[in-house]
């Protein structure tokens, strides 16, 4: 049984850092484990221009504690009106590494998102031309579609036509949650990848309801059936370079999670690599963790691998019940429980 595993320093290819006091509270958790992260642009207001991305990047770097090394990889928020010129400027900036597609109303702060992908043809053509990846929240939001079917329907309605019309566009299918999505990414032609979260590797939808409502397991896309979880584990541990680590760590104050209309999102930045190690260990695939966490993402984005390392040791430790979060507190996934791996 492996007791210690040292890997190339990993990256997080899907992260929410928020802003202001919340940013300052959560950034050190990510920087302790990851060399870089793709930063989601769904602030209020959203980050829709290169100028806004540059300012947000500066705020992130200003919040980074002294002695910590971390590179934020910025993204723009795609809207129905994103001009092609902004895409060209984003690519030229050197610090914007993708453009995020949120279907309007799909998740937190997505109200300004895309209402019809056909309205974005100019921006998408520019992205394909300059080589800027499209990062897709892959769910439809129609009221008549069951929430557990949103991802599968998105593949048929949006992803398939998108890939047909822009076959050379680099696309990341973010935080996939279904066997359908895993199979789609595995079999797709052209430059397609996918991020997978630790919580979707470890849990199925029963976790939300065991013994009562468990709001800290509620995220979007929502956890799915066990058959889908098993398919995600198989994809992540397959050795395919199309699948890579993206925590989708999404902090919300405790009072906004434990609420009559609670926010979606799981906070995992504090213990992300420990959770991934648990998932890969359970699958008997610790030897596949380094590629998933440290190699596949940089290869897809055309970036060098990190030069440092991170060590995971088999060691029991108790996760805090809550964490400081500005004037509030934040409850991490599995709060107060014992974890079996420790990152150093």
Curated annotation (Swiss-Prot):
Keywords: Hydrolase, Metal-binding, Pyrimidine biosynthesis, Zinc. GO terms for molecular function: dihydroorotase activity; zinc ion binding. The modification N6-carboxylysine is found at residue 100. GO terms for biological process: 'de novo' pyrimidine nucleobase biosynthetic process; 'de novo' UMP biosynthetic process. Signal peptide: none annotated. Substrate binds at residues 16-18, 42, 137, 220, 252, 264. It catalyses: (S)-dihydroorotate + H2O = N-carbamoyl-L-aspartate + H(+). Binds 2 Zn(2+) ions per subunit. The active site is at 248. It is an enzyme of class 3 (hydrolase). Zn(2+) 1 binds at residues 14, 16, 100, 248. Its cofactor is Zn(2+). GO terms for cellular component: cytosol. The keyword Metal-binding applies. Pathway: Pyrimidine metabolism; UMP biosynthesis via de novo pathway; (S)-dihydroorotate from bicarbonate: step 3/3. PANTHER family: DIHYDROOROTASE. Catalyzes the reversible cyclization of carbamoyl aspartate to dihydroorotate. This is Dihydroorotase. The lineage of its organism: Bacteria, Pseudomonadati, Pseudomonadota, Betaproteobacteria, Burkholderiales.
């Amino acid at each position: 049984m492996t007791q210690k595993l040292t890997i190339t320093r990993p990256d997080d290819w899907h992260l929410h850092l928020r802003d202001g006091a919340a940013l300052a509270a959560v950034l050190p958790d990510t920087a302790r484990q990851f060399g870089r992260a793709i930063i989601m642009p769904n602030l209020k207001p959203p980050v829709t221009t290169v100028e806004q991305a540059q300012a947000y990047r500066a705020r992130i770097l200003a919040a980074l504690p002294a002695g910590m090394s971390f590179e934020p990889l910025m993204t723009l928020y795609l809207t129905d009106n994103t001009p092609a010129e902004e895409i060209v400027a984003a690519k030229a900036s050197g610090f914007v590494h993708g453009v995020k597609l949120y279907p309007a109303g799909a998740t937190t702060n997505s109200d300004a998102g895309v209402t019809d992908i056909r309205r974005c043809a100019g921006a998408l053509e520019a992205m394909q031309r300059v080589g800027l990846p499209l990062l897709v929240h892959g769910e439809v939001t129609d009221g008549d579609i069951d929430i557990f079917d949103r991802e599968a329907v998105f593949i048929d309605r949006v992803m398939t036509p998108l890939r047909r019309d822009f076959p050379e566009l680099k696309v990341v299918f973010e935080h996939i949650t279904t066997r359908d999505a895993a199979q789609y990414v595995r079999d797709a032609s052209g430059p397609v990848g996918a991020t997978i979260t630790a919580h979707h590797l470890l849990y199925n939808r029963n976790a939300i309801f065991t013994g009562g409502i468990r709001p800290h397991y509620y995220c979007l896309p929502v956890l799915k059936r066990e058959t889908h979880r098993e398919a995600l584990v198989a994809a992540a541990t397959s050795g395919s370079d199309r699948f890579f680590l993206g925590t989708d760590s999404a902090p919300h104050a405790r009072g906004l999670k434990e609420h009559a209309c609670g926010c979606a999102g799981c906070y995992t930045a504090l213990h992300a690599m420990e959770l991934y190690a648990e998932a890969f260990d359970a699958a008997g695939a610790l030897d596949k963790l380094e590629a998933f966490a440290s190699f596949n993402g940089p290869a897809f984005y055309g970036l060098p691998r990190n030069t440092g390392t991170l060590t995971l040791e088999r060691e029991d430790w108790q996760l805090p019940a809550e964490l400081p979060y500005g004037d509030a507190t934040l409850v991490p996934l599995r709060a107060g429980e014992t974890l079996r791996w420790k990152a150093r």
